Amino acid sequence: MTKKRVQQLVAIVCSGAMMLSAACALNRKAPALPTYDKQDFVFFGFWSPYDFTEESYALYRQSGLNTMLFTNHSVQTASSDNLHYLGSGATMRSLELCRKTGLNAILNYGWWYYEWVEGGKSYGDTPFSDYNLYEDYKDMIVGVHIADEPKYNQIDDYAKESLIADYKRVYDVPYMLNLYPSYAGQDAIGYEGYKQYVQTYADKVLTQFDDNRLLSVDFYPFRASSSSMHSAWLACYNNVASVAKSTGSKQSYYIQTAVGNEFQGELGQDEICMQLNVAMAFGADWFGFYCYEMPRTYLEDGTYEPMYSYCMLNPDGTPSPLYYAVQSEIARVSAFSDAYLAYDWVKTVPVTPAGAKENYALKLISGSDFSGTSIEQVTAGSDTVVGCFTSEKGEAFMVVNYGTPSEKKTSTTTVRFGRDGYAAVYGKSGAPEIVKLKKGELQLEMASGEGRFVTLL
């Protein structure tokens, strides 16, 4: 056989092999969705129900909230029966009602409630041991709320080694202090900047716990002073997420569900959707909703004024439109909690549309890029944030359209990966989609505030 004939045969064989390979690639069956261990988000409302009835607690549960934080101080006359603190009648009644309605519970330390009711009397040095009354409910207690928004010079009060040692003798759940947002004044967060405020709390409090570490913040982005989102929102979350990552802490973010007063005059499902998605772009594990019940200001004549126009409930205690918006959005994100919670947050990267002026909010977190990930490039028709995650299963990304929800603009975000294959896309209503990457690219159509959680298969 001549050399030329051999070369022709080799060419034919190689060509056939290539065609067969290409055909197999075209006909390759899409992979199945991976399976994940069952995990749930924690959803709770701040300002718990006024009425200690099974009907009231069932209404709370039907909203999608699965945990009750025992705190509510809108009372005309303070008593053990209407304030939640260690040893109060209200705490025991709420635990019993939570048991009946399928809710988990976050106890309230409530030292100042106790002093209010007891005429200035102190808990003493070992409050958790002295009021260790809830052993029968330990299976449903997922945390203890210690304080809301401690100032920088109050952190030491909650970081006392003797207090935390007493706590650890009784409880093996998060010791919860909800921190100020970054827009608080220097009298609240100190003069060294917001990240130092968060880091100081982590160094003084969280490091005393080997596990069950939780960082919580309440940043409400839809302020009355603006028709859009507060420009420091992303930077605040980035600071909290970075400290949480370095300390191995879970993260809890409050979702704004109050309208009027210091907040914008209208909120709807689009704003709830966006807040959940943005928090998830930074690795959220827990979500609080402020407010569930309406805070009240009591007047001298015994009447009261509502603090807001409406919350999840109206001033008369009936469900508002936000109740149903929260219900729908909790169902949406809960549908992929197993997948999302299987991954750990690494960083969040901002993306500005080509030729557009950089949004100041995105500029504040502009130090991150996609190095170290499978993403080569992201192009977007709207401001976008991309949370980058990893686990033993691989990489995942939370892609969020950071456009103002009220503008209701839809745009395309194109994510180009360094390889072909498939991706699972979660976050729309309904079942997740398995999408074949076209030339390594994934296109996502999202309205302002919408997000998609993407895992590479």
Label every PLM stretch briefly:
Residues 1-29:
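Gram-positive cell-envelope targeting signals
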